[in-house]
From Swiss-Prot:
Similarity comment: Belongs to the protein kinase superfamily. STE Ser/Thr protein kinase family. STE20 subfamily.
Listed InterPro entries: CRIB_dom, CRIB_dom_sf, Kinase-like_dom_sf, PAK3-like, PAK_BD, Prot_kinase_dom, Protein_kinase_ATP_BS, Ser/Thr_kinase_AS
Active site residues according to the UniProt entry: D1073
Binding positions (ATP): I959, G960, Q961, G962, A963, S964, G965, G966, V967, K983
Location of this chain's protein in the cell: Cytoplasm; Nucleus
Protein name: Serine/threonine-protein kinase CST20
């Protein structure tokens, strides 16, 4: 008779007739209870086993002459059944036998549950049986002694049956089994169904009850061999259906368990020829370790998804789970051992075991001494592959360690997802298998540790995923970063790293060094604030970016600080190339500073207004050494700003520079000149661009230079490679082209490089200045290819923005004219230092050619602009393609661009990438701005009246002029007596169109007696007409400057203003620009607030604002300090306006705006010139308005109840002042 185990589908032979006879005892029936352990424990002996009664019926299908059928026949029959049940499973199982992955995947889930169940057994009760079983004789596979089949009959007493049961348990416990053959989930469920440790399985009238019973017995015996017997309370037999499902799940659930046939002739055994079984974990010989801290198994099992299959089956049979009792608490655990995916023999390598300590948690386990582990290592051996040979009994502490390991694994895997199973370093194999396990461990870690889907257990998944996240996380490089310099303060209170433009600003604004040291943080805040408000913050950031790149020499904008090498000559080139704020938007694909420079030469981009277009051309072209110092010395955008007037509002003076320093750089090869730090930063800073002027085109052309190329170029400053690079005269700037064209031109130049990929400067242009050396460009191209950095070619950038290289005819003409310029670096130096006659001739011819070229390109630029306007809403790629096509078609009649620019930018230069990224961001911002403008115009069309205001309002009389339009008076056609004020604005010239929409919307929704009434708005031919109520009395500024106001009159103005502010604040609107200019009066003295362009909307989400707007002298400290602010900023401005009415001007009006901001931020509440002459009420009111801490500052409603307001005069008291102001104003105008 064969006993089929779920872990070993091959029948196991029984040689002892005494031990096999009880299987055929007809008394064995559904009530059979199997001894719980391999040895006869005291409790096992006292437990009677009811003999089965229908054994013969279950084997009636057997045709063997034996009473219970032939063992071989049973084996064949069982194999056939297994083939159906475990068809695909066997393949995976066989793979796992050789250390494959399946073992670590599916069996991990099943075996964790089984291990917990196995560990519940009492290790002490198995010691005695271990002694008995060690001397069992060996048996041969497939042999049977059939005499035992006839010794017992149906009337055998129960004692004999019990002895047979125990002997069969002992015998089967010695059978070899594959690693990881702990109970499968199916067997565990069967055991849980009966709620006993040894699992009583009852079969009632089932056709295959004997086979199922044999299968169950084998599993129980194997389980008992690993776990000590435990007293089991009597069990209520389960129903036939549940028992059948439990038993049938034994085979179906064993998907990844190792299976070793006991019959070597079996066909399945051939598949397992490569498998090496592990040792039978013996019985524990040492005393049990102290129990670990209590573990709430229920919580662990609830959290873990590993028990999903077991729990489902267990819940179906309404049986309690054995894992949920407290028996596991008495089993010692080790925190440095665990089961690797599927249960295997304990690792024999102590060091490998200890390595796993870091991968497991010690929170729920108790550490044991390692003496037992090291002891067992020396005595453990491996089983033979066949089960026929009796295995050598391993040392006793081996089993103890395995129990510990199993328990630790179950606890840890469910408690902390540290990847115990998958990433385990401890492979419980013995002998040589341990070595292969270490290899497989790495495979598991690499294959499953990073893949969530491959692991079947959630705990191991989470552990491996946490590990993989750490490994796989890739932090991208920063983008959109604008912080390029850090300004610090040393111990002496002086600034470190302060940008030069900031130093100039501070010195020009009258902020002394002492004041800077007293309030260093305030100075930095107000300077940053001033820059943000006086210029485009994005442009300022890009300027710093540009400057910083020069400083580090890592960026492609190498020539930003070099004298404007732009052919347009003049500092504008340097400004444009060098990072003037406005130029940044035009530096799109940094890939072509060259083309960009061509564009900039021809077109002065709005941001790059050339310093003095004519002066700069000649001063830099003819006498480069005179003005270059200023450009080069600062090395910061400030210098460019100053000279190029990029930021006209900035009063900073030019920094002094040493023109002779340029001579030091002049002898350098163009490459070194183009590099910001070619030899030393000091040289470049101090050097005037005289040499740069000569080589200016080459400098500007340089895109980005890698560190390698920098070194190589430095080492070969005087090498022959650069002998022919002669200084090219910068082309004159082109004032004739309007700004709008310059923008499109720069875009076209940028777009072209994108397609051409011309990152290395267009070398062919160099031929323009070296007639005899037309082949030189190729030579230099090859040379620079090796360095992967673009050479600084002296190509003529003045050409139109579209073609990177000047026309061929121009090149040949220039070549013939100035061949000697490229002879050698020494010659280049001589040309720079020698009289300017040759240089002037070159410049003249160059300018003439450039002028012709510009005239031809003017029409093309206009066409490009129109095309760009049509394609504004398309994505950047489409727009680029369109512009490139237009550019190519436009430039084809002149000269095709040289193919050299098609080189890709050097990937090795990090600075080039940064520069390219900055240029792309700039281009993107421009596109976004255009889209935003279109959206604003579309919004205005929906807000404004589509009619023609000229049909409704006549007799327009201009009474004022603003930055973006004029103010007119007109009569309403519908009521001639009604005079209205019309604010006419050119949207193209309006810097912040969104403010207009804001103003219209606020005025439309703000109908209040103290707010100027909004009548209507019109959008006519690009001009916005805003029709408002006309306040003929003028502004409060006229009264303040032409008369002296009493406290009562001041109180009236404050009261009416506070009423309007209270209304605005109640609607969530902050005016942010309260001052006398925005308080209008009529002839009767009525007061109304106007100019809502800067007003801000406050909502629940954004209860405070941090933008910086308004007029500096009236600004609250929290705005100047760039802190969050709320409606109380209008109260501060009202307090400043009171001082204005008292003293005729706001505080610090005579100071520069920057110093005024500094004083506001540092002085706090401004001091009155003559406070003694004022009453207590006005001083108290004023102090309440001018609290530096806005939390202590009053709001509009509180101020309206102040005595100063309640006791003020009537509005009619202002009428005389209005009339006086009008008379004085009229007399002044006459």
């Amino acid at each position: 008779m064969s006993i089929l185990s779920e872990n070993n589908p091959t029948p196991t032979s029984i040689t002892d007739p005494n031990k096999s006879s009880h299987l055929h005892n007809p008394e064995l029936n559904s009530g059979t209870r199997v001894a719980s352990g391999p040895g006869p424990g005291p409790e096992a002996e006292s437990t009677p086993l009811a003999p089965p009664t229908e054994v013969m019926n279950t084997t009636s299908a057997n045709t063997s002459s034996l009473s219970l059928g032939s063992p071989m026949h049973e084996k064949i029959k069982q194999f056939d059944q297994d083939e159906v049940d475990t068809g695909e499973t066997n393949d995976r199982t066989i793979e796992s036998g050789s250390g494959d992955i399946d073992d670590s995947q599916q069996s991990h889930n099943n075996n964790n549950n089984n291990n917990n169940n196995n560990n519940e057994s009492n290790p002490e009760s198995s010691e005695g049986d271990d002694e008995k079983t060690q001397g069992m004789p060996p048996r041969m596979p497939g042999t049977f002694n059939v005499k035992g089949l006839h010794q017992g009959d149906d009337s055998d007493n129960e004692k004999q049956y019990t002895e047979l049961t125990k002997s069969i348990n002992k015998r089967t416990s010695k059978d070899s089994y594959s690693p990881g053959t702990l109970e499968s989930p199916g067997t565990l469920n069967a055991l849980e169904t009966n709620n006993v440790s040894p699992a009583v399985i009852e079969e009632e009238q089932h056709t295959s009850s004997l086979e199922d019973l044999s299968l169950s017995l084998q599993h129980q015996n194997e389980n008992a061999r690993l776990s000590a017997p435990r007293s089991a309370p009597p069990q209520v037999p389960t129903s036939k259906t549940s028992s059948f499902h439990d038993m049938s799940s034994v085979i179906s659930s064993s998907t990844s368990v190792h299976k070793i046939p006991s019959n070597p002739t079996s066909t399945r055994g051939s598949h397992l020829s490569s498998y090496k079984s592990t040792l039978d974990p013996g019985k524990p010989a040492q005393a049990a370790a102290p129990p670990p801290p209590e573990i709430d198994i229920d919580n662990l099992l609830t959290k873990s998804e590993l028990d999903s299959e077991t729990d489902t089956l267990s819940s179906a049979t309404n049986s309690p789970n054995l894992l949920r009792n407290d028996t596991l608490q008495g089993i010692p655990t080790r925190d440095d051992e665990n089961i690797d995916d599927s249960p295997r023999q304990l690792s024999q390598n102590t060091s490998a075991t200890s390595r796993n300590t870091s991968g497991t948690s010690t929170s729920t386990v108790v550490k044991n001494s390692r003496s037992g582990t090291s002891k067992s290592t020396s005595t453990s051996t491996a089983h033979n592959q066949t089960a026929a040979i009796t295995p050598i009994i391993p040392s006793h502490n081996k089993f103890h360690q395995q129990v510990i390991n199993t328990n630790a694994t179950n606890s840890l895997s469910s408690l902390e997802p540290l990847g115990v199973g998958i990433n385990s370093n401890s492979s419980p194999k013995s002998g040589k298998k341990r070595k292969s396990g270490s290899k497989v461990r790495g495979v598991f870690s690499s294959m499953f540790g990073k893949n969530k889907s491959t692991s079947s257990s959630s705990s191991s998944n989470s552990g491996s995923n946490s590990h993989s996240q750490e490994v796989n996380i890739k932090i991208s490089t920063p983008f959109n970063a604008k912080h390029l310099a850090h300004v610090g303060i040393d111990d002496n209170g002086s600034y470190t790293g302060l940008p030069i433009e900031w130093e100039r600003l501070l010195s020009a604004s009258g902020i002394t060094k002492k004041e800077q040291q007293q309030h260093p943080q305030a100075v930095m805040d107000i300077v940053a604030f001033y820059q943000d408000t006086s210029e485009n913050p994005d442009d300022a950031a890009f300027k710093k970016f540009h400057f910083d790149n020069n400083k580090s020499s890592s960026s492609g904008w190498s020539n930003e600080n070099t004298p404007p090498a732009t052919p347009g000559g003049s500092n504008s080139g340097s400004g444009s190339g060098g990072g003037g704020a406005p130029s940044s938007p035009h530096r799109t694909p940094p890939s072509s500073i060259i083309e960009k420079n061509n564009v900039e030469q021809k077109v002065i981009t709005p941001s790059q207004s050339m310093p003095t277009k004519t002066e700069s051309k000649q001063s830099e072209n003819q006498h480069p050494h005179e003005d270059n110092a200023t450009q080069y010395t600062p090395r910061t955008p400030t210098s460019h700003v100053q000279e190029g007037q990029f930021i006209p509002s900035r009063p900073a003076p030019k920094p002094p520079s040493t023109p002779l320093s340029s001579m030091s750089v002049s002898h350098k090869t163009p490459s070194s000149q183009s590099l910001p730090r070619s030899d030393s930063q000091s040289d470049i800073r101090s050097s005037t661009p005289k040499s740069h002027q000569d080589v200016s085109p080459s400098k500007i052309k340089i895109r980005s230079i890698s560190s390698k190329s920098l070194k190589s170029m430095r080492s070969r400053k005087s090498g022959d490679k650069f002998t022919h690079i002669a200084p090219a005269p910068p082309p004159p700037s082109l004032p004739s082209i309007p700004k709008s064209k310059s923008h499109s031109a720069s875009l076209s130049s940028q777009l072209r490089p994108a397609t051409n990929g011309s990152t290395t400067a267009p070398i062919p242009a160099s031929a323009a200045f070296g007639g005899e050396n037309n082949a030189l460009p190729k030579q230099r191209i090859n040379e620079f290819k090796a360095h992967r950095a673009p050479p600084p070619p002296p190509s003529a950038p003045p050409a139109p923005p579209v073609p990177p290289a000047p026309p061929a005819n121009l090149l040949s003409e220039q070549t013939s004219e100035i061949p000697q310029q490229r002879t050698a670096p020494s010659q280049a130096l001589a040309d720079v230092t020698a009289p300017t006659n040759i240089y002037e001739i070159q410049q003249t011819k160059y300018q003439e050619a450039q002028q012709k070229l510009r005239e031809k390109k003017a029409r093309e630029l206009e066409e490009i602009q129109r095309l760009r306007e049509k394609n504004e809403r398309q994505n950047r790629q489409q727009e680029t393609g369109q512009n490139n096509a237009d550019t190519a078609s436009g430039g084809s009649n002149i000269a095709p661009p040289v193919p050299v620019p098609n080189k890709k930018p050097p990937s090795g230069s990090g600075g080039g990438r940064d520069a390219k990224q900055a240029a792309l961001i700039a281009q993107k911002k421009r596109e976004e701005k255009k889209r935003k403008n279109l959206q604003i115009i579309a919004k205005l069309k929906t807000i404004c009246n589509p009619g023609d205001p000229n049909e409704l309002y006549v007799d327009l009389v201009k009474i004022g002029q603003g930055a973006s339009g004029g103010v007119f008076l007109a009569h309403d056609v519908r009521d001639k007596s009604n005079i209205v004020a019309i604010k006419q604005m050119n949207l193209e010239q309006q810097p912040k169109k969104e403010l207009i929409i804001n103003e219209i919307l606020v005025m439309k929704g703000s109908s209040h007696p103290n707010i100027v009434n909004f009548i209507d708005s019109y959008l006519l031919k690009g001009d916005l007409w805003v029709i408002m109520e006309y306040m003929e009395g003028g502004s409060l500024t006229d009264i303040v400057t032409h008369s002296v106001m009493t406290e009562g009159q001041i109180g009236v103005v404050c009261r009416e203003t506070l009423k309007g502010l209270k209304f605005l604040h109640s609607k969530g609107v902050i005016h942010r620009d309260i001052k006398s200019d925005n308080i209008l009066l009529n002839m009767d003295g009525n007061i109304k607030i106007t100019d809502f362009g800067f007003c801000a909307q406050i909502n629940e989400i954004n209860s405070k604002r941090i933008t910086m707007v308004g007029t500096p002298y009236w600004m609250a400290p929290e705005i100047v300090s760039r802190k969050e602010y709320g409606p109380k900023v209008d109260v501060w401005s009202l307090g400043i306006m009171i001082i204005e009415m008292l003293e005729g001007e706001p505080p610090y009006l005579n100071e520069t705006p920057l110093r005024a901001l500094y004083l506001i931020a540092t002085n706090g509440t401004p001091k009155l010139k003559d406070p003694e002459s004022l009453s207590y009420d006005i001083r108290k009111f004023l102090a309440w308005c001018l609290q530096v801490d806005f939390n202590k500052r009053a709001d509009a409603d509180e101020l309206l109840h102040d005595n100063f307001i309640t006791e003020c005069d009537d509005v009619s008291s202002l009428s005389p002042l209005v009339k006086i102001a009008r008379l004085k104003k009229m007399s002044e105008s006459d």
